[in-house]
């Protein structure tokens, strides 16, 4: 056995890469600090220091390098989350004293006194405050939330939620497979019927994907909390888990589509900046009964809500473009959401001219079906041409056969990116 010359041996220096925080780390830090801010007494130096540090982390999330993730859909979702949380902080932290403003409802009449909570309970109160989106069980429950399911046992509810969870994943896998089939012909040049088919696939695919972004956690969590009676007390009731989306039957106008049928996850934080700005107006304007002033307040709030929603979604495209070294872009998000608000204003004006008033009355058959046709046509066209196509192109997705195929590919990668699809895994094993 050869002898080793110990005197000539030198230790090998391990190469280490310097650790640096990316935007995902700063997003998480900003959230943790937001939960910590209400733990410090209001008006103290500690409170202001925590708040300043929280704001710094929130801003740094938009400036630091994005996570090293090549998946466009994941990057987009992380960017939307960043924008969503900033809007949430503006509403529940920056413009108010949260422990004095936001209270959980103990029963139908009694709000919880947050100032009397112990330190551990106040921490979990703050964690819930910055986590919930629709204010269910709080004194700020948003309007338009769909009614809770008909009375059923908690085990029936849990089973139904898990079934929806499975169907959701099956729908995502179906979107992926269908998009692959439609895109499999490299020479396809869609005719008008083909266009309609692709439009429908894009809109339905996006709808299922958006639904999954909320349901992926809410469905199993609700089944766990209600079925096993675990978690916060308010989460253990079936009534605490109403559907994310309302009935399609309500979508006989563009206003009702966005107000009742579509999800309400962003409604509170999207409307908060506009409500705050309106509150700064003189009392004479705030309380004026003049029709012109009331209409100006109403439609200003409407437009500002859609603009903020556009900004939140634009953060997603911003995150993708800077991560992949593409030209910075909002992907048309601002235009798309602003035009939704303008469409509602135009619709209201048209109803006023025609003498149509849907408030408090059930529409007639003609009104309902004409409304369905107009709303569906507007939504499908705008969802594809004003959002799907521009976002896909901004993300660097191109197809020589046309922009519709680029949007279709965006739908496919978005559906595939949703984690934990056990239905797709089982399908691959079987087939």
Swiss-Prot record:
GO terms for molecular function: O-acyltransferase activity. Its main location: membrane. The chain crosses the membrane at residues 198-218, 301-321, 336-356, 404-424. The keyword Secreted does not apply. O-Mevalon transferase; part of the gene cluster that mediates the biosynthesis of macrophorins, isoprenoid epoxycyclohexenones containing cyclized drimane moieties. The first step of the pathway is the synthesis of 6-methylsalicylic acid (6-MSA) by the polyketide synthase macA. 6-MSA is then converted to m-cresol by the decarboxylase macB. The cytochrome P450 monooxygenase macC then catalyzes the oxidation of m-cresol to toluquinol. Its EC number is 2.-.-.-. It is found in: Membrane. Pathway: Secondary metabolite biosynthesis; terpenoid biosynthesis. The keyword Protein biosynthesis does not apply. One of its GO terms (biological process) is terpenoid biosynthetic process. It comes from Penicillium terrestre. The gene is macI. The macrophorins cluster contains a single gene insertion (encoding for the terpene cyclase macJ) compared with the yanuthone cluster that produces the linear compound yanuthone. This is O-Mevalon transferase macI. The lineage of its organism: Eukaryota, Fungi, Dikarya, Ascomycota, Pezizomycotina. Glycans are attached at residue 176. It comes from the Eukaryota. It is a multi-pass membrane protein. GO terms for cellular component: membrane. PANTHER family: LONG-CHAIN-ALCOHOL O-FATTY-ACYLTRANSFERASE 3-RELATED (PTHR31595), OS04G0481900 PROTEIN (PTHR31595:SF57). Belongs to the wax synthase family. Keywords: Glycoprotein, Membrane, Transferase, Transmembrane, Transmembrane helix.
